[in-house]
Amino acid sequence: MIGRIYGTGSYVPNRIVDNNELSKYVDTNDTWIRERTGIARRHVIEEETTSFMAVQAAKKALLQSEVKPEEIDLILVATSSSETIFPCTACIVQSEIGAVHAVGYDINAACTGFVLAFQTAQAYIDARIYKTALVIGADSMTNLVDWTDRSTCILFGDGAGAVLLRAEEGKPCLMAAHSDGTKANALTGMSRHHKAVTSLEDKITYVHMDGQAVFKFAVRKVPEIIEELLADASLGVEEIDYFILHQANKRIIEAVAKRLRLDLTKFPMNLEEYANTSGASIPILLDEMKRNQRFQRGDKVVLAGFGAGLSWAACMFEW
């Protein structure tokens, strides 16, 4: 069984912060940011919350798929920036969209989260436990960054994306995933310390990243897991139509394409407009591509996420 994508949806805040505006707060400029990241602007929340964005993306996916909320069996939300530790964001989404028969829970795996959530939904569907699943990636990353830290504030934006999966007969989704907790300190967010014993001056609650370590990890491990995934099905990388990678950095995506000896046209990007939206980046891109009719039935599509943990995951399915 395969969970076929019947609908997609996305939401990004109206407020746009471009690179020129950022240069008012930190020592940077548009050229410097574009050359190193490929990012030109990012959408930033004002009154929105992570759950609000997730709900908007979910409603669009439902509308496109023509699936009724009460038909949904499972809601998974990949997020590392929910406004509450509990209840989970998925339960808020369930209530807001009226998915009265669905079970919902969150997956906290940062930028790898959406791929892991997608894999989880596919596994439930392949096991014939659930027939209809809503998988969402939503993050409010700009709440977590230090706007005086040039190494991180230029990278992130906010948004949400959703896909609606329905069970069909077909080849199951191929899946692979790994973690390396020994390198957890390379990319961290929030704090192990209670808010009462920290102060804004400590800055320990913000995102901290060893950019060089994360870059080296991504350009090595992402090609490896893609090749591992496809080898299990005796497929070559050249047989894949699209590689939808987490939209972290243009240089990372270019390096992955180069290591796989593939043309960059197989690696769609939208980070110029949205920056790194963490768990939301892949479903936002999927939604854009579907709305622009980029996919044809039978296309072989690889999703690959990578990030904090350190963690990395990939899956392949036919559209």
Protein language model annotation of sequence segments:
Residues 126-160:
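Flexible, glycine-rich active-site loops centered on histidine and acidic residues
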Residues 34-36, 40-52, 79-133, 258-285:
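Conserved catalytic cysteine-centered active-site region
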